[in-house]
Structure formats: C-alpha cells, structure tokens
Amino acid sequence: MKVLGIDTSTKTTAIGLIEDDEVLCDYNLTGRVAHSESVTDMIHEIFEKFEFGLEDIDLIAVGIGPGSFTGLRIGITIAKVMAFALDVDVIGVSSLVANAMSDYGLVSTIVDARRGNVYASIIKNSDEPEVLFEDEILPFEQFKDEVKKYDVITIAGLDGDKFIGEIDNAKLSKNKSMRGSNIARLGLIDYKKNGPMNAFNLVPNYLKISQAEAQYEKNNETSK
C-alpha cells in the first residue's frame, strides 16, 4: 500500500510517503510559511519526482495532535478533502507517538504546552510502538515523576532540548523533527488492525488540562 503521511501539529510541516515497509520520501519545512500553503506545495513537489501520481495513493494518514490548534485543523481538513477527492481511506494518528518512532527502546515525545505544562507520551518502540503512557497534557513537574519510573529514556520532539536538562535519566534524540513517514507508518499499522476511520469522526485531539492538574499548577505557583 502507498500511504501519504501529513502532520501540521507543530511549527514544522511534515509530509512523508511510504509503500508498505519502504520509506519513499520525507519532506520537512519549519518556518513562517502557512501550513495551508506548505502542505499543498510539498505534496505537489513530491509527486513530481515519482512515476506514479497522487491518484495512486491507497491511504492518507494525518497527525491529530495534540499540538497547535490552528495547525491541526489545517492538516486534518486537507487530509479529509484529499481523501474525498481521491476516494481513498483516511486515518488519524497520534502526533506524539509518531514523533517518537524515529528512535528505538523507551522514547518520550515532549511538547511545550505553555504555563509549565507539556503534551507528552511514552512508548516502547521496536517494529511497532507500544504505548506505555497515553497522550496527555500535564504539568512538566508531574511528568518528571512519570519518567523516573524508567532507567533510561530518550526524549524526542522539537522542544526536547528545553526539558532534557531537568530529567536525570534521559538522553536527547537526534531525531527532533516530525517525519511524515512516521505518520504514514503508524497510520498503516492502525489501518491493518482497525480499518479506516469515518472521515466525519476525524477531529483534532485537543487535550485540555484537567481540573486536578490545574489545581496542582495553582498550588505550585502559590508555593513559589
């Protein structure tokens, strides 16, 4: 199967293409260009380099976050429109899990969610990712307690270098940016297990801080 992967959950636009287990290409663009422009431009450029066209795609996978609210809406909308126009299946996957799939072993993706909070997940990655800590938004200080449960863990994500110095048992991934091929790979794994998603049910994963976590943060600020 040829799978197109799209992620716009961060300031990086990531587009990747795989055919079964083979990565055909990865394109990344980080900067001020609007996701809506960069996604379409990058997809057009990709298919100029291959002997097959966009109409030969079998599945579209898209990162559903958590991450940038605006970015997620753009990426998911583009994926839905393309799937409808091409009459192919579409599937949404965790951007955090996909980001961690560039490394093996215990890997955590950490994204700055502001005000002392992070979006985070933990996986054990080999041929397929095993999720040990589901996507969540929580105070970074609280997440550090979660990470301490493991001997050594790799920290991935664009914001990893902001937090690595505060985690004693961690090392920084060399693969900081999202890869669209990881989105495509995770999409294919989920598709084989669960089949396609109903496009109407494909929505961003807007994680919101819970009341308990908000109180934890408030107590921390009060004690400073």
List each language-model region with its residue ranges.
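DPxDG-like acidic metal-binding loop motif
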Residues: 59-89
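Residues at secondary-structure transition points
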Residues: 30-41, 69, 73, 77, ...
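Acyltransferase
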Residues: 173-224
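Surface "functional belts" at beta-alpha junctions
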Residues: 22, 89-178, 206, 211-212
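Phosphate-handling active-site elements
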Residues: 50-55, 84-93, 195
